[in-house]
Each structure stands twice: as C-alpha cells, then as structure tokens.
Amino acid sequence: MPEVGLSVFLRIGPFVHGEVRNGGFPDWIIEREKEGMAIRCNNEEYLGYVRRFWKKVYAQVDGCMEKDGGPVIGIQIENEYGHVGGLQGPEGEAHIRTLTAMAKEIGFDVPLYTATGWGGAASAICFRSWAATVKHHGSENVRD
C-alpha cells in the first residue's frame, strides 16, 4: 500500500464481528466452544489458539508497521467486547489487557485500539483513548 499512499488499520480480532460468520472465528473454534472451551476470556487453551493465529498474521505483516516505513498505522484488538459476547467488568478488562500485552509481545508495534459504542464495554480503561467532537449536519460537507 505505500506505493498508493494508503494507510492501514489492521483488525486482528480474534473476534472481529463485521457481520461475518462466527464473528470471524473458524468453525472449529465454535465447535470447541460447544464442547466446553471458554472463548473471549483468559482461558489458557483459547489464548494459545489466539497466540498461534496472531503469530501467523504477524509473519505476513512483519515489516509493514509504520515504524518500518509500512502502511499499518493501527491495530484493532477484539470488537464490541462486552456487548456482543465477552465479559464485562474486571474479568473483561483483564482479558483486553491480556490480548493487548500478547499483541505487543508478538510484535504488533503500532497504536492498539478497540471499537465498541455500547455501555458496559471493558475497553474504556484498558487503552489510552481519545474522542473527537464532530459537528455533523447531514450532507453539508459532501461536496468539499
């Protein structure tokens, strides 16, 4: 993407939602959940699968981080955690912190964030965050 000037926000999940099948989880993870494996929490077995997946993702984007001159400027951890599945409160916060530490350890060295617009989300105190107040009046600036 550097050749066309596009920046990338990479969504590594492990749950990405995006209105895709199983929120992006492979069928076999859902089968393991049905067999009793807890997902989207600090279950060691689940975290092992996340680590293995993220290492494979990182192998494909190694050298593509902004610090390396690449287009990846941010990485989304999880999605709608605490609203569409996941834990709330201290357990949810602990899980988001675990995922964040794992991503950094693997080498995802760009700003990390998560996305949710719902109350009860565990992420609010887990990331340094910012908010912008945007004046939006319908189609006012569409032609600019």
Stretches with model-predicted labels:
Residues 89-144:
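Noncatalytic carbohydrate-binding groove/subsite architecture in carbohydrate-active enzymes
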Residues 1-109:
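Active-site mouth of glycoside hydrolases
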